[in-house]
A protein has these predicted regions:
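Hydrophobic alpha-helical segments of small multi-pass membrane proteins
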Residues: 125, 142-146, 164-175, 189-191
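Surface-exposed strand-loop-strand hairpins of Gram-negative outer-membrane beta-barrel proteins
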Residues: 47-75, 164
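Cleavable N-terminal export/targeting peptides
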Residues: 1-36
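Predominantly the C-terminal beta-signal and adjacent terminal strand-loop region
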Residues: 31-36, 52-56, 63, 171, ...
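Gram-negative (and chloroplast) outer-membrane scaffold detector with strong preference
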Residues: 47-49, 73-155, 209-221
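Short, hydrophobic/glycine-enriched beta-strand segments
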Residues: 39-46
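Outer-membrane beta-barrel translocator domains and adjoining extracellular loop/strand segments
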Residues: 53-61, 103-112, 150-159, 197-204
Length: 221
């Protein structure tokens, strides 16, 4: 329902703001601290929480609910530029590519259930608000782009819904701590609000879905 969905989004944003405030203090005191660098490249391994209890999603692919693969593994790559600072906020612009996958093979004791594969890919620009200095900083960011979400049970490999571009809003936050002059440990918690798809071949449309992805890895400046 729209009201419930809006409350969920507000709750998530407030949680991210509290996280950013918690980690926004400088990593170590310096006078003066270095500014946030002009650019950063991120490379993260990620864990997407693919839904495994969404009957509408299963129906859109002509699947049983128990066939949905669920949690998977992925990769996030990002490039961000930081051209402008105003008081305590450094503004950033950039982009992110996120890819992830999951596989599920049911036990042999459940013959009606089919093996299934799940693939997700998102590409989007991002605007970020950054708090901290060049030794370490936290951020809130978001953007609008497109994604493709393929959920393929065995025997239904040629499904138009798996190749349908879906408008997707991503929003989240994270932090970077520089453990060496040019290398940082970084993490990111991101939500992908995926628009509903179209109905194909007599199957219902895929529902509006929010996918959460947690990533961690390195950043290079």
């Amino acid at each position: 329902m729209p009201g419930v969905r809006m409350r969920h989004i507000v709750t998530r944003v407030l949680q991210l703001v509290l996280l950013v405030l918690f980690v926004a203090s400088p990593v170590r005191a310096q006078d003066p601290p270095p500014r946030i660098p002009w650019f950063v490249i991120d490379a993260h391994g990620s864990v997407p929480r693919f839904p495994s209890d969404n009957q509408e999603l299963a129906d859109s692919r002509d699947m049983e609910l128990a066939e949905l693969p669920g949690r998977g593994l992925g990769l996030q790559l990002g490039v961000h530029l930081y051209p402008l600072r105003w008081r305590a906020i450094t503004f950033g612009v950039g982009g992110e590519l996120a890819v992830s996958r999951s596989n599920k093979t049911p036990p042999e004791s459940t013959p009606p259930l089919r093996p299934a594969k799940e693939r997700y890919r998102s590409l989007a620009p991002q605007l970020s608000f950054n708090f901290g200095n060049g030794n370490g900083w936290s951020y809130l960011s978001g953007g609008i782009g497109q994604s493709k979400w393929a959920i393929t049970p065995e025997g239904l490999e040629d499904n138009p819904q798996d190749d349908e571009p879906l408008k997707t809003i991503n929003y989240g936050g994270g932090a970077r701590w520089f453990i060496k002059p040019h290398v940082a440990f970084s993490f990111d918690v991101r939500f992908y609000a995926i628009n509903p798809g179209l109905a194909f071949d007599g199957r219902p449309a895929s529902p509006r879905t929010t996918l959460m992805v947690i990533g961690a890895g390195v950043s290079i400046k």
